[in-house]
């Protein structure tokens, strides 16, 4: 397995241009329909049991896309303001984790329908965030522990009301 912009893929055939089978849901939930031959993608191989973890665990199961609303370029860093898909809003917390285009990142300030990400020089230099611009779509994978916690609390609260 490997991931392109955070999208987990299985190779269907190997050769001079690996072939991947993509499910319809993958095409609907990701930015794949918006990329071109010249687009730069973040590529990453699956981790192994002895791989060092440099962030939170990322599965490659994309939950949706977010539109880049603003890019603030600084000397070596960048700040991005990204629209949160409405169905994912409840999973975004200040200092929580999110994977954007496959990169494990920490959430900055959360607004009503958007959030900030502050990219460090290393992330800007080795990812496609170097070329990100307003209007681009970014793949979003919400951190699984956050989803599990929110959903458990919601279920317990509903059971207590009943």
Language-model features, listed with the residues they occupy:
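Glycine- and charge-enriched low-complexity intrinsically disordered segments
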Residues: 39, 45-49, 139-144, 151-156
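Anionic-ligand binding region
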Residues: 64-73, 79-82, 88, 94-96
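A structural feature that tracks compact, well-ordered secondary-structure segments
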Residues: 13-14, 21-22, 71, 90-123, ...
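Ordered, amphipathic secondary-structure segments that act as subunit-interaction surfaces
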Residues: 22-65
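Short, compositionally biased
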Residues: 24-27, 55-66, 111-118, 122, ...
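Short, conserved secondary-structure segments in the cores of folded domains
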Residues: 28-31, 53, 88, 94, ...
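Single conserved hydrophobic/aromatic residue that forms the stacking wall/gate
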Residues: 1-20
């Amino acid at each position: 397995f490997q991931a392109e912009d955070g999208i987990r893929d299985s190779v269907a055939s190997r050769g001079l241009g690996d072939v991947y089978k993509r499910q319809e849901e993958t095409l609907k939930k990701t930015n794949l329909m918006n990329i071109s031959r010249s687009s730069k993608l973040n590529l990453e191989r699956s981790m192994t049991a002895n791989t060092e973890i440099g962030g939170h665990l990322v599965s490659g199961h994309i939950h949706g896309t977010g539109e880049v609303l603003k890019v603030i370029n600084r000397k070596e860093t960048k700040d991005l303001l990204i629209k949160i898909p409405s169905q994912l809003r409840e999973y975004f917390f200040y200092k929580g984790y999110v994977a954007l285009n496959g990169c494990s990142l920490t959430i900055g300030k959360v607004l009503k329908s958007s959030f900030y990400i502050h990219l460090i020089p290393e992330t800007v230099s080795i990812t496609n965030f170097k070329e990100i611009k307003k209007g681009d779509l970014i793949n979003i994978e919400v951190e699984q522990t956050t989803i599990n916690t929110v959903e458990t609390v919601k279920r317990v609260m509903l059971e207590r009301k009943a």
